[in-house]
C-alpha cells in the first residue's frame, strides 16, 4: 500500500495523550465542538514529535490504572517543560502530579464515582464562569495527597481535597473530574476555558475550512490518475463519493457490490440516486447468488462476518482488475475506526498495544496488501457527526445523511443462524415495516437505529381458526450519541402496536413480534 496521508494536512491545535481512557475520543469530539481541531495520540509520543507538531495545548486523558502500578502508562516528562499549556484529566492529573514531585495515594473508602458538587477555592482561568457547587462527574479511586511545588488547589469536593489544581506560571492544570462527559454541568465551560483562554486557540475548525483545505490536497495527491471507491450507500461512503466527485469528477469510479443482504429497495435507490440523478459513475455488481452460496450451512456469526468480508475482497479484486487499472483506492475510514483498529496506544519500541483491541473495522487494513493501490482517505480524521455536516454542505439529502447505521454484512447478521432466501425476504419486509412506521410516527431522526431481527426458532400462534408455527421477529430500537453506548428507545405503545400488527399480517412466516429493551452495555446494538 502507498502512503495514506495527504500532503500539508492541518496540525492539531490540541493534542490528547491517551492513557487508555474510555473517554479519550469524547475529549477530542468536545474540543471539535468548540471549532478547534484536536487529535488523540499515543502516550508514548516524544517531546521532539510534539515540538514538530507544535500544538497550542496538550491534554492528558484519564485511564483505568493507578499511577503506582508497575505497568502504569507514562509520558515523556519533558512535556511539562515545553511551555505548552497542559491539562491533566483524572489519571492524567495524577500522573502529572507524581512526575513533578507530588504524591498520590489510594482513596480507600473515599473513592468517588458519579455526580459530585465542586467547591471553588480560588479564581482561575480554568474555572472561569463555572458556578460554585456545580455538578461534575467523578470516576476515580486514587487521590492527590500533596501537590508539587508551584501548584495550588483551586477546587475540592466533599471526598476529594484536590478536585482541580493550577500552576499558572508554567501553564499546568489538572481536574479530577471528567469535563468531557455530559453529566458534568459546566464541563464544556472548563474545556473552552483551557482551549480558548489558556491555550489561545482560534475557533477555525469547521466544514467550510475542511473543504477548502481538503479538495486541493486530493487534487494534488491524485493528479490525473483514476480513483476507485467501494460505495455502500451509507453516509460515510456517500459523503466520500460526493467529496471526490467535487474534487476530481470523472476520474472517480464507484463500485457498488450487491451481496444480497441489503435493505428493501436499497440497491435500486442507490443506483437511481448516484448514477442517474447526480451522474456519478457507478458500476453495479450483482453478487447475490455468490454470497448466499458461501453462507450455505453457516450459523456462527463471526464465521458469517469473515466469509462475507473475505468474499467482498475477492469480488472487489476481480472487478477492480476488470474495470481498471486504478492508481488509487478511496476509503471512507473515519477517525474512530483509526483509534479502535490501529490503536493510539502503540509502544513505538515494541509495537505492542496498551489497550485491548476492540474490533477490526472493514475500512482499516481490510484489503490484502498485494492490491497495489495508493490510499485516499480524506475522512480519516473526522468523527461521524462531522461527516454528516460535511455531507450536508456537499448537498447530500437527508435521506442519506440521516439514515441509520447499517452493518457491512447487512441482513445476514440480523438473521440468527443460517441465512436463506426465504429468511432474507421475510426479514427484509419486516425491517421495512419497522422503519416505515418509525418514520410515520416522526421518530426516525430521534433514534440512532431501528431495525428487525429474525430468530432461528419458531413459536406457536393462532391466526383465524388455525394453529400457526412460525418465526418471531425482534424489534430493536436504540438511542445513542455515537454507538459506543446506547439505551433502548421508549417507543409509544401505539407505534409498537402498529408495527406488530403490520408485521404479523403482512410478512409471511412470522406470527410474533417482541421488543428488545436491553441497553449497551451489557448488550450490543446488533444481535450478532
UniProtKB/Swiss-Prot annotation:
Keyword check for Ribosomal protein: no
Pathway: Purine metabolism; GMP biosynthesis; GMP from XMP (L-Gln route): step 1/1
One function term, GO molecular function aspect: GMP synthase activity
SUPFAM superfamilies given in the database record: Adenine nucleotide alpha hydrolases-like, Class I glutamine amidotransferase-like, GMP synthetase C-terminal dimerisation domain
UniProt keyword annotations, A-Z: ATP-binding, Glutamine amidotransferase, GMP biosynthesis, Ligase, Nucleotide-binding, Purine biosynthesis
GO CC annotations on file: cytosol
The Glutamine amidotransferase type-1 domain, residue ranges: 13-204
Class of the enzyme per the UniProt entry, highest EC level: ligase
Residues annotated as binding ATP: 232-238
Residues the record marks as active site: 90 (nucleophile), 178, 180
InterPro entries xrefs: Class_I_gatase-like, GATASE, GMP_synth_C, GMP_synth_GATase, GMP_synthase, GMPS_ATP_PPase_dom, NAD/GMP_synthase, Rossmann-like_a/b/a_fold
Reactions the enzyme catalyzes: XMP + L-glutamine + ATP + H2O = GMP + L-glutamate + AMP + diphosphate + 2 H(+)
GMPS ATP-PPase domain ranges (all copies): 205-403
Domain of life: Bacteria
CDD domains assigned to the protein according to its UniProt record, in alphabetical order: GATase1_GMP_Synthase, GMP_synthase_C
Disulphide bridges, residue numbers: none
Classification via PANTHER family: GMP SYNTHASE [GLUTAMINE-HYDROLYZING] (PTHR11922:SF2), GMP SYNTHASE-RELATED (PTHR11922)
Quaternary structure annotation from Swiss-Prot or TrEMBL: Homodimer.
Alphabetical list of NCBIfam families matching this protein: guaA_Cterm, guaA_Nterm, PRK00074.1
Cited function: Catalyzes the synthesis of GMP from XMP.
Name of this chain's protein: GMP synthase [glutamine-hydrolyzing]
Organism: Prochlorococcus marinus (strain MIT 9515)
Amino acid at each position: 500500500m502507498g502512503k495514506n496521508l495527504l500532503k500539508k494536512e492541518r496540525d492539531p491545535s490540541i493534542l490528547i495523550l491517551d492513557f487508555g481512557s474510555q473517554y479519550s475520543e469524547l475529549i477530542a469530539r468536545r474540543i471539535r465542538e468548540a471549532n478547534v481541531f484536536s487529535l488523540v495520540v499515543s502516550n508514548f509520543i516524544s517531546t521532539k514529535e510534539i515540538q514538530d507538531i507544535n500544538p497550542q495545548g496538550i491534554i492528558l486523558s484519564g485511564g483505568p490504572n493507578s499511577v503506582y502500578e508497575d505497568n502504569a502508562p507514562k509520558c515523556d516528562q519533558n512535556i511539562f517543560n515545553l511551555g505548552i499549556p497542559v491539562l491533566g484529566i483524572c489519571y492524567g492529573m495524577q500522573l502529572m502530579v507524581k512526575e513533578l514531585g507530588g504524591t498520590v495515594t489510594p482513596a480507600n473508602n473515599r473513592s468517588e464515582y458519579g455526580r459530585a458538587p465542586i467547591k471553588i477555592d480560588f479564581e482561575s482561568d480554568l474555572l472561569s464562569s463555572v458556578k460554585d457547587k456545580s455538578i461534575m462527574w467523578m470516576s476515580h479511586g486514587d487521590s492527590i495527597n500533596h501537590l508539587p511545588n508551584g501548584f495550588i488547589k483551586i477546587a475540592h469536593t466533599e471526598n476529594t481535597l484536590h478536585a482541580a489544581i493550577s500552576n499558572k506560571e508554567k501553564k499546568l492544570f489538572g481536574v479530577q473530574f471528567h469535563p468531557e462527559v455530559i453529566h458534568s454541568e459546566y464541563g464544556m465551560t472548563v474545556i473552552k476555558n483551557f482551549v480558548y483562554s489558556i491555550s489561545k486557540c482560534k475557533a477555525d475548525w469547521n466544514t467550510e475550512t475542511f473543504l477548502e483545505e481538503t479538495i486541493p490536497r486530493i487534487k494534488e495527491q491524485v493528479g490525473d490518475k483514476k480513483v476507485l471507491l467501494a460505495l455502500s450507500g451509507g453516509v460515510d461512503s456517500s459523503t466520500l463519493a460526493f467529496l471526490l466527485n467535487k474534487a476530481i469528477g470523472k476520474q472517480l469510479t464507484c463500485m457498488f457490490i450487491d451481496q444480497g443482504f441489503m435493505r428493501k429497495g436499497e440497491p435500486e435507490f442507490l443506483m437511481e440516486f448516484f448514477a442517474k440523478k447526480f451522474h456519478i459513475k457507478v458500476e453495479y455488481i450483482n453478487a447475490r447468488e455468490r454470497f448466499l452460496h458461501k453462507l450455505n450451512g453457516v450459523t456462527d456469526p463471526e464465521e458469517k462476518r469473515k466469509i462475507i468480508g473475505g468474499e467482498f475482497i475477492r469480488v472487489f479484486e476481480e472487478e477492480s482488475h476488470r474495470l481498471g487499472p486504478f492508481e488509487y483506492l478511496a476509503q471512507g475510514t473515519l477517525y474512530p475506526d483509526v483509534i479502535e483498529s490501529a490503536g493510539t496506544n502503540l509502544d513505538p519500541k515494541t509495537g505492542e498495544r496498551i489497550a485491548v483491541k476492540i474490533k477490526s473495522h472493514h475500512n482499516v487494513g481490510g484489503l490484502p496488501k498485494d492490491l497495489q493501490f495508493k490510499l485516499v482517505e480524506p475522512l480519516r480524521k473526522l468523527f461521524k457527526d462531522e461527516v454528516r455536516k460535511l455531507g450536508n454542505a456537499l448537498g447530500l439529502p437527508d435521506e442519506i445523511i440521516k439514515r441509520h447505521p447499517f452493518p457491512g454484512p447487512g441482513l445476514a447478521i440480523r438473521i440468527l443462524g443460517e441465512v436463506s432466501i426465504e429468511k432474507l425476504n421475510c426479514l427484509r419486509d419486516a425491517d421495512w415495516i419497522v422503519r416505515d412506521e418509525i418514520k410515520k410516527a416522526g421518530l426516525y431522526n430521534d433514534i440512532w437505529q431501528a431495525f428487525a431481527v429474525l430468530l432461528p426458532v419458531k413459536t406457536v400462534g393462532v391466526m383465524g381458526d388455525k394453529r400457526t408455527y412460525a418465526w418471531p421477529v425482534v424489534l430493536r430500537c436504540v438511542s445513542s450519541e455515537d454507538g459506543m453506548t446506547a439505551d433502548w428507545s421508549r417507543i409509544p405503545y401505539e407505534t409498537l402496536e402498529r408495527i406488530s400488527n403490520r408485521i404479523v399480517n403482512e410478512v409471511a412466516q412470522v406470527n410474533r413480534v417482541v421488543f428488545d429493551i436491553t441497553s449497551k452495555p451489557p448488550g450490543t446494538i446488533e444481535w450478532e
